[in-house]
Each structure stands twice: as structure tokens, then as C-alpha cells.
Amino acid sequence: MKKYNLEDFKLGWLIGDFEPSILRTDQFEISIKKYSKGDYEKAHIHKLADEITIIIVGKVLMNGGEYKANDIIVIEKGEATDFKVLSDTITVVVKTPSVPGDKYIEPHLKLSGIV
């Protein structure tokens, strides 16, 4: 048995083709991310990976749509999304495959109307 602490991993990313990683694999990535109300991630796309975001706790705005605890959002490769935190939130994110650097900011897009 091994013990890890989520705080030891970069932005909650704990499995994937990167270090540190509990399991190094190029097949998928998993993160458990904590956000505070008001946090915002600019619109971006993944050219190679599909992403599944599960809202465990909290409420967020993605592409102008509001999502809450227990919602599962599937974002296909090439589909842009932004992410505005409406209340303190915890997510689980799965991306497949795991491709380091496969995040491309789309600065001209304001999908949730955030300026």
C-alpha cells in the first residue's frame, strides 16, 4: 500500500503522461481539482483529447451553461469551453488520451460572456 496527498500533484493532476504521477500512462489523465468562487479558466480547446468533467460539489458556468453537483459534461476534442466558478467547486476530470501540452487557449472566445 502506498499513500499520496492530492496537494503533492500539480493542479490536482494525479494520473497521466506527466510527473509527478501516481500512474504514468499516455492512455488517459485524471485530476481532482478544487476551485474557489470567482475562479475562471479562459476558453480553450484540446486538439487530441476528449474531456469528461464531473461536478462533485459546487456550481460552474461552462460555455454559458450552468452545471451543478452530479452533472457530467463531455467535451469532445476540438470543442472550445471556458470555466467560471459560481460557488466553491470540486471536480473530477478525465481526459483521453493523455497528451502533454494539448491545451490551446482561445483568447478571442468569451463563451460564458465573461470579460
Sequence positions of predicted segments:
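A generic "binding-loop/recognition-motif" signal
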Residues: F28, L48, E79, S87-T89, ...
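A short beta-strand-loop-beta hairpin characteristic of the jelly-roll/cupin
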Residues: H46-D71, I105-E106
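A short, N-terminal "cap"/entry segment at the start of jelly-roll beta-barrel domains
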Residues: M1-Q27, I32, H108-V115
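Short histidine-centered beta-strand/loop micro-motifs
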Residues: S21-R24, E41-K47, N63-G65, K84-V85
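Short acidic-glycine-tyrosine-enriched beta hairpin
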Residues: N63-D82, T91
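Conserved hydrophobic/aromatic positions in well-ordered beta-strands
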Residues: S31-K33, T53, V92
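Conserved short histidine dyad/triad with adjacent acidic residue
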Residues: D26-H46, K77
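A short hydrophobic beta-strand segment most commonly corresponding to one strand
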Residues: S87-H108
